[in-house]
């Protein structure tokens, strides 16, 4: 069975991490969780242990891109060949913020996209607010009647269930093509899923992303410099929904951490 490594990046804001962890209780069984913590000063690390999630900590804050790259390296390190000579462990890597809610079924829909289309990176839909600058990912672009329920975190599972209901109805009318994934020129980095083909775009043996972009620009630069020139566009899976609170962590809050390197914000 192909498995997925879900890497969640954290820096404080443990109240949102708790909400995220609670949503993970009902997701698919073939998903393992790894938390990369950027030197939180609250109870985030203790909470990870309470929920039974593996967590990698840092002695000092090194930024979001460092966390992404550590997650990617762990993904690569956990490939191995078992006694039967078959690849084992993870075929898929998800990198996600902690301020999200993942409904049951959303990851399966993303995985199904990889089995049908030749993509290396796929993203879910979210609310218009949650997708920020990339409105192509907004669920309201692809379905009618999802708002205002989709904007309420209490309905995140119901929204995913309604999407599957629509998918079933469209399949019965032979119009399933309407829900085919859409290639995009950009994607929002709050949640993205990759398959093993992503290794072809790595920055170095241990890094997928350009490390000089310490907090911002990382997904955009990766997309424009790596994926698009190879005609391997990030694509939105219209049948997957992940709720994103958005704007939970701000640079001003991060600077309060005494161990937070000021160089994080000097990404030129």
Go through each PLM region and give its residues.
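A recurrent flexible, glycine/aromatic-enriched loop bordering the glycosyltransferase active site
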Residues: 156-165, 171-196
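N-proximal low-complexity "stem/linker" segments adjacent to membrane-targeting elements
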Residues: 1-23
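Short beta-strand-to-loop acidic/aromatic patch adjacent to the donor-nucleotide binding site
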Residues: 85-101
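Short, acidic, metal-binding catalytic loop of nucleotide-sugar glycosyltransferases
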Residues: 22-31
């Amino acid at each position: 069975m192909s498995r997925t490594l879900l890497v969640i990046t954290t820096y404080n804001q443990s109240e949102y991490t708790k909400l995220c962890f609670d949503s993970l209780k009902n997701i698919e069984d073939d998903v393992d969780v790894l938390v990369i913590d950027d030197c939180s000063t609250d109870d985030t690390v203790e909470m990870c242990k309470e929920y039974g999630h593996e967590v990698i900590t840092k002695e000092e804050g090194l930024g979001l891109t460092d966390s992404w790259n550590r997650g990617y390296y762990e993904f690569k390190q956990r490939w191995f060949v078992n006694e039967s000579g078959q690849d084992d462990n993870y075929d898929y890597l998800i990198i996600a913020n902690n301020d999200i809610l993942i409904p049951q079924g959303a990851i399966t829909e993303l995985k199904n996209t990889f089995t049908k289309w030749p993509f290396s990176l796929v993203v879910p839909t979210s609310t218009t607010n949650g997708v920020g600058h990339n409105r192509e990912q907004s669920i309201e672009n692809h379905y009618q009647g999802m708002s205002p329920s989709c904007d309420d975190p209490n309905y995140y599972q119901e929204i995913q269930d309604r999407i599957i209901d629509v998918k079933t109805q469209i399949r019965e009318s032979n119009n399933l093509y309407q829900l085919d994934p859409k290639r995009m020129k950009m994607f929002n980095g709050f949640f993205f899923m990759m398959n093993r083909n992503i290794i072809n775009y790595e920055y170095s043996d241990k890094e997928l992303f350009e490390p000089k972009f310490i907090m911002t620009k990382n997904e955009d630069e990766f997309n424009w410099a790596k994926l698009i020139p190879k005609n391997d566009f990030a694509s939105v899976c219209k049948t997957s929904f992940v709720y994103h609170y958005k704007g939970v962590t701000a640079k001003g809050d991060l600077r309060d951490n005494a161990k937070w390197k000021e160089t994080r914000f000097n990404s030129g």
